[in-house]
């Protein structure tokens, strides 16, 4: 049998095979036979490479930003007078038991995953609501369904002041059905040894904040009380013709509580 290939001199397959050992007998085509097919014989499919993005990219952490945010919050809380530090849930309950509804304080959370806890006197007695921290913001701890509707704030004092103002606006409202305050589920337990209200966990309690419970050992100075009055009456202290030192003192605590 004769194998014909394209080229100047046809070669016999027998001659080609005879030149190589039996274990390596294979047919090698000359160079002209390996020429590429003309363009258009088979349409080439061009696929563009698109960058593949990770579905769940990890969030970029900012330890320095978190440290500054938490340090600023601690500074505000110490100036407030109603930050009680590392007291337990039982101690907070004793302090708030005989206080009117809406009296509150902020303390350190005994749960390792939280920094602060808001203890408040409700219609069902004192209860505790954890304050969670994430992405340089603070928000009230709630169940998964209502968490997207819970507002976030840059510090704890701003968070508390917002809900105090919201409750005050609802109280002054003349409408028969004022806007409800956030409904929060009762916390399970602030720590394994801490007790909360003896009611089912699924029961919701409307948050009502009226007045802070100032710690006696953190009695607020006359300067601080004057600063609170100025903050309530003036929206922007920078517009006041004050000495720089006094203006700086007002900026150190820009709140009304």
Swiss-Prot record:
Region described as Disordered: spans on this chain: 170-192
SUPFAM superfamilies on file: SH2 domain (SSF55550), SOCS box-like (SSF158235)
Pathway: Protein modification; protein ubiquitination
The keyword Protein biosynthesis appears for this protein: no
SMART domains: SH2, SOCS, SOCS_box
GO CC annotation terms, alphabetical: plasma membrane
Domain SH2 span(s) in chain numbering: 82-163
Tissue spec: Expressed in kidney, lung and liver. Detected to a lower extent in stomach and heart.
Induction pattern: By a subset of cytokines including interleukins 2, 3 and 6, granulocyte-macrophage colony-stimulating factor (GM-CSF) and erythropoietin (EPO).
Segments forming domain SOCS box: 208-256
Presence of the UniProt keyword Transcription regulation in the record: no
Alphabetical UniProt keywords: Growth regulation, SH2 domain, Signal transduction inhibitor, Ubl conjugation pathway
UniProt record, GO biological process: intracellular signal transduction; negative regulation of cytokine-mediated signaling pathway; protein ubiquitination
Summary of subunit composition and partner proteins: Stably associated with the tyrosine-phosphorylated IL3 receptor beta chain and tyrosine-phosphorylated EPO receptor (EPOR).
Job of this protein: SOCS family proteins form part of a classical negative feedback system that regulates cytokine signal transduction. CIS is involved in the negative regulation of cytokines that signal through the JAK-STAT5 pathway such as erythropoietin, prolactin and interleukin 3 (IL3) receptor. Inhibits STAT5 trans-activation by suppressing its tyrosine phosphorylation. May be a substrate-recognition component of a SCF-like ECS (Elongin BC-CUL2/5-SOCS-box protein) E3 ubiquitin-protein ligase complex which mediates the ubiquitination and subsequent proteasomal degradation of target proteins.
Protein name stated in the entry: Cytokine-inducible SH2-containing protein
Organism: Mus musculus (Mouse)
Gene: Cish
